[in-house]
């Protein structure tokens, strides 16, 4: 999914984030790598960092069953009098995977997040007029000791968890991938997911965009 690397978007100042590894930790922390770090990195914890754009691109890659797109803002260039100089075609790569049926498993799991009885974003399925698959999340700002309990009210606001939601729609013919992060807001299901629903409603229903 290209985590830890720049996406290649045609905007300045992009950072690649961190996808930690044994080599990265030795170089940057001068510390050994532990087995548990492999596990927590797989769910985005530890030293791993990613931008909302990277999360949206990873979500789009899942929706497209492995096609990883390079994001771009400029679609074409033209002169002052309107003459077209260059039409810019989207670039993409295919993510290698041993069993391509795993894409369907992931998509179904994300679908159940919205439509399943125990889905963490099942409230989004209230009068939903398009199919939506997603994933809620909570990004920790700092780590707790094993014996400590996270109680938001007892923690300074700037240190509280970030709320996260990422998803795509429609499921059958994906057009939009979205990633929402609400800083220090807590629950992704109650804070970030409703914002995603508002934006997607605007895109598909209130002001539909012709593709």
Model regions and ranges:
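Short amphipathic alpha-helical face segments that pack within enzyme cores
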Residues: 51-57, 191-198
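Beta-lactam-recognizing serine transpeptidase/beta-lactamase-like catalytic domain environment
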Residues: 1-177
């Amino acid at each position: 999914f290209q985590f830890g690397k720049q996406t290649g978007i045609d905007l300045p100042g992009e950072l690649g984030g961190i996808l930690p590894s044994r080599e990265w930790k030795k170089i940057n922390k001068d510390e050994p790598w532990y087995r548990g770090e492999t596990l927590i990195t797989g769910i985005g914890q530890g030293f791993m960092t990613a931008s909302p754009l990277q999360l949206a691109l990873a979500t789009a890659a899942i929706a497209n069953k492995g096609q990883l797109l390079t994001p771009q803002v400029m679609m074409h260039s033209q002169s002052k009098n309107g003459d077209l100089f260059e039409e810019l075609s989207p670039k993409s790569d295919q993510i290698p995977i041993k069993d391509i049926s795993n894409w369907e498993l992931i998509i179904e799991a994300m679908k159940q997040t919205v439509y399943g009885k125990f889905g963490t974003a099942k409230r989004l399925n209230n009068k939903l007029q398009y199919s939506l698959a997603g994933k809620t999340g909570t990004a920790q700002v700092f780590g707790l000791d094993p014996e400590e309990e996270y109680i938001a009210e007892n923690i300074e606001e700037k240190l509280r968890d970030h709320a996260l939601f990422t998803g795509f729609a429609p499921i059958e013919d994906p057009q939009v991938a979205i990633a929402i992060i609400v800083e220090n807001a807590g629950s992704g299901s109650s804070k970030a997911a409703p914002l995603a629903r508002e934006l997607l409603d605007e895109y598909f229903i209130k002001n539909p965009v012709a593709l």
